[in-house]
């Protein structure tokens, strides 16, 4: 498959350094890669190795990981290690309808929208206009706006939708949305709450237990890379540790 005008490609060098480039025909200077004329990529095969300056660079289609790294940030974002748990534990798939509380910089929205495409949708509630404007720029840059509907509303005041597959909350007070989430979810649907503090988890779980939710669980994901070389293998000294706690539950008819 060849690269075409207006494609988005990711450049990856031998050390794993990467950047995303819009093949718009423009020339730009990119830190670590030098001056790049994106028009020169048109017609090249994906996976091809080229030389930029003195380094070898490969041209590939961007993965979700690459899109994540390219996002500008206005608020703390949910990282891939936590987003993956949300996707799997809530069984979010192509065609899913997901209500999101708190869009922030749009990082989780970006990944969820790629998962639910082309027939699903992310309905994101956000009460701050500055976050909405910022997130929309990110979503537009990674071309997923077609799968996202944004409502400038406080989700603690209610959710319009019914029979949705999942409700995902990244707000300071998720316990104030639990009843609204139960009303919005289909039977068997899932709720996921991202909370940096354990005190938030406790209040959220207490509210979940008051309603017909079961399979209530809270997890924390820690990520550590392994350094593999010719002379031996060891864990990296740097570990991506605590970012937040994830609380999950499923809606039932009665308890």
What are these regions (language model features)?
Residues 175-245:
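C-terminal substrate-binding/active-site "lid" region of AdoMet-derived donor-dependent transferases
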Residues 105-118:
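Conserved SAM-binding loop of SAM-dependent methyltransferases across substrates and taxa
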Residues 118-123, 191:
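Short beta-strand element of Class I
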Residues 125-174:
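S-adenosyl-L-methionine
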Residues 1-61:
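N-terminal auxiliary segments of SAM/dcSAM-dependent transferases
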Residues 70-84:
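Conserved SAM-binding loop and adjacent beta-strand
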């Amino acid at each position: 498959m060849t690269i075409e005008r207006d494609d988005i490609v990711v450049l990856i060098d031998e050390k794993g350094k990467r950047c995303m480039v819009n093949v718009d025909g423009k020339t730009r200077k990119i830190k670590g890669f030098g001056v790049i004329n994106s028009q020169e990529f048109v017609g090249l095969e994906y996976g091809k190795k080229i030389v930029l300056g003195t380094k070898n660079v490969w041209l590939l289609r961007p993965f979700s990981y690459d899109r994540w790294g390219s996002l500008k940030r206005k608020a703390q974002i949910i990282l891939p290690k936590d987003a993956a748990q949300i996707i799997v534990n809530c069984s979010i798939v192509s065609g899913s309808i997901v209500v999101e509380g708190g869009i922030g910089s749009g990082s989780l929205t970006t990944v969820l929208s790629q998962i639910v495409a082309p027939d699903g949708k992310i309905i994101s509630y956000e009460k701050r206009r500055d976050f909405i404007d910022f997130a929309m720029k990110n979503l537009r840059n990674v071309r997923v706006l077609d799968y996202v509907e944004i409502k400038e509303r406080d989700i603690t005041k209610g959710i319009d939708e019914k029979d949705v597959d999942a409700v995902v909350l990244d707000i300071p007070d998720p316990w104030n949305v639990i009843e609204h989430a139960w009303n919005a979810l289909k039977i068997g649907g899932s709720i996921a709450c991202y909370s940096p503090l354990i005190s938030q988890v406790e209040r959220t779980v207490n509210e979940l237990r008051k309603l017909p939710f079961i399979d209530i669980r809270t997890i924390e994901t820690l990520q550590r890379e392994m350094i593999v070389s010719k002379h031996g293998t060891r864990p990296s000294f740097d570990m991506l540790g605590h970012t937040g706690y994830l609380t999950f539950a499923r809606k039932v008819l009665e308890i």
